[in-house]
Swiss-Prot record:
Entry's localization field: Secreted
Misc: This peptide is an evolutionarily optimized stable analog of somatostatin. In addition, it adopts nearly identical conformations as in the somatostatin drug analog Octreotide. As this drug, it contains a D-Trp at the same position, whose synthesis is a common strategy used for enhancing the metabolic stability of compounds in drug design.
Cysteine pairings via disulfide bonds: 62-67
The keyword Transmembrane is assigned to this record: no
Keywords: D-amino acid, Disulfide bond, G-protein coupled receptor impairing toxin, Gamma-carboxyglutamic acid, Hydroxylation, Secreted, Signal, Toxin
Entry's Gene Ontology molecular function annotations: toxin activity
Protein family per UniProt: Belongs to the conotoxin C superfamily. Consomatin family.
Tissues of expression: Expressed by the venom duct.
Name the UniProt record assigns to this protein: Consomatin Be1
Length: 69
């Protein structure tokens, strides 16, 4: 338990130290994530994992409780 406390304290110091040197919070937060993790990268990886259109079944759209056969 004591080890977890010190790990937490050191992480807080590691995150807040650049702020005391004049850094901006946004820059500190961005430095915590790897450079290749961007919204564009995440979107591309999600699209590449998506099944092809032939695998996706079309669900009939029902309007006014009348569904196509």
């Amino acid at each position: 338990m004591e080890m977890a406390y010190w790990v937490m304290v050191m992480m807080m110091v590691w995150i807040t130290a650049p702020l005391s040197e004049g850094g901006k919070l946004n820059d500190v937060i961005r430095a915590l994530a790897p450079d290749d993790v961007t919204p564009q990268f995440i979107l591309r990886s999600l699209i590449s994992r998506r099944r092809s259109d032939s695998d996706v079944r079309e669900v009939p759209v029902c309007s006014w409780k009348i569904c196509p056969p």
